[in-house]
A protein has these predicted regions:
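A contiguous active-site-proximal alpha/beta segment in oxidoreductase catalytic domains
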Residues: 97-154
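Rossmann-like dinucleotide-binding domain that binds NAD(P)(H)
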Residues: 152-219, 223-227, 239, 320
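Conserved acidic residues
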Residues: 32, 65, 140
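N-terminal Rossmann-like dinucleotide-binding module
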Residues: 1-49, 171
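C-terminal helix-rich "cap/oligomerization" subdomain common to oxidoreductases
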Residues: 59, 66-69, 290-292, 299-344
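NAD(P)-dinucleotide binding in Rossmann-like oxidoreductases
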Residues: 209-300
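Beta-loop-alpha module in the N-terminal Rossmann-like domain of NAD(P)-dependent dehydrogenases
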Residues: 15, 49-107
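A short helix->loop->beta-strand "cap" motif at the edges of active sites that frequently abuts
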Residues: 51, 86-88, 113-116, 207
Length: 344
């Protein structure tokens, strides 16, 4: 399987490096080379990793069975449409496109040409999330915060498509219900697109998600909190540090055998909720500190893409998943624009 990398900026270089590692460990995977509009950058990366530098997208296409698109979001559609027409399997960095119409066309071409698209919503492969998935149950309230500093590198899209899209995808994957209502607000500060946004998403099944994203923070923050009713539990994830904690009600005798309560915060919370032991007959509050595997989420999702192509199996993050994420992102942007018009 010959795979090319399109766009070798910071993220594209990560893809190239990991693809080379995967190719080294595999008998049927080969990095065919790289392509970038910045030819100097492409040649620099090609020399660094010992691969070909293609002078055009057409030349790369002729040498590949699949490709990784790690270019700016606004260019995803045109590049993907061209490659799908040549029957290439595609890994497209998130978001899949900027509009529903573009996503629908890519999905049509994917089906028409019998190929696979996987969208790079990397947090689905985050080891911290995977460590707590078995304990989450049915989330009825999710709180997500994703903050970063301002970067001129990403100003072609709003913070909703740049950062919030990660948590939109996670929320949609964790709450299996149609959306009932969306309320949102946001502001433009240093760019012509939204730099800060917050949204409340209400679902038909009664679940709610509050999602906040900003690229105006001095410090990075990537946290997710779940409150579930079946089983009754609370889970906290810090994607930046890879740490996770779970508190849940269990029957007497079913508490985790690995319950060292090393965290002072955990001990304090159990003390605060001590009355639960008295009010919930036969139930105790258990603390679980899941062991988070030391894996590379980007490598994991690339390997999943390769296996999807190799075995002709569905992608964990499909083109339809990518479409749904940008559909919700679009509704959030529309709600923010409507609120801004009212203020004016």
């Amino acid at each position: 399987m010959n795979i090319g990398v399109i766009g070798v900026g910071k993220l594209g270089e990560f893809h190239t490096k990991l693809l080379m590692e995967i190719a080294h460990d595999s008998k049927d995977v080969h990095c065919a080379g790289v392509y970038d509009l910045n030819t100097e950058r492409a040649e620099e990366m090609a020399k660094k990793y010992g691969v070909a530098s293609f002078s055009s997208l057409e030349l790369l296409t002729r040498s590949c069975d699949a490709a990784i698109i790690a270019t700016t979001t606004s260019s995803h559609y045109e590049i993907a449409r061209t490659l799908l027409g040549e029957k290439l399997h595609l890994f497209i960095e998130k978001p899949i496109t900027t509009t529903i119409e573009e996503a629908d066309e890519l999905i049509r071409l994917e089906k028409e040409n019998g190929v696979h698209i996987q969208v790079g919503h990397i947090e689905r492969f985050n080891p911290a999330l995977r460590a707590v998935e078995a304990h989450i149950g049915r989330p009825m309230y999710i709180q997500a915060e994703r903050l970063s500093s301002f970067s001129r590198r990403v100003t072609d899209v709003s913070v909703v498509l740049d950062l919030m899209i990660h948590d939109i995808d996670l929320v949609l994957s964790l709450i299996p219900s149609e959306i009932k209502n969306i309320a949102a607000s946001g502001v433009k500060v240093f760019s012509n697109e939204l730099d800060m946004a917050t949204a409340r998403i209400d679902f038909v099944n009664g679940a709610t998600a509050n999602v906040t994203a900003s690229r105006l923070s001095r410090n990075r923050l990537r946290k997710l909190r779940f409150f579930s009713d079946n089983p009754k539990s609370y889970a906290s994830l810090d994607f930046a540090t890879g740490k996770s904690e779970v508190f849940k009600l269990v029957k007497q005798g079913e508490a985790s055998s690995k319950n060292p309560l090393k965290s002072f915060a955990a001990r304090k919370i159990l003390e605060q909720f001590g009355e639960i032991h008295e009010n919930m007959q036969g139930m105790v509050l258990d603390y679980i500190h899941p062991e988070v595997p030391k894996t590379n989420a980007l490598r994991d999702e690339l390997e999943h893409f390769i296996n999807t192509v190799r075995n002709n199996t569905p992608a964990t993050v499909s083109s339809l998943d990518g479409r749904r994420a940008i559909m919700v992102a679009g509704k959030i942007a529309e709600e923010i624009a409507a609120n801004a018009a009212i203020r004016e």
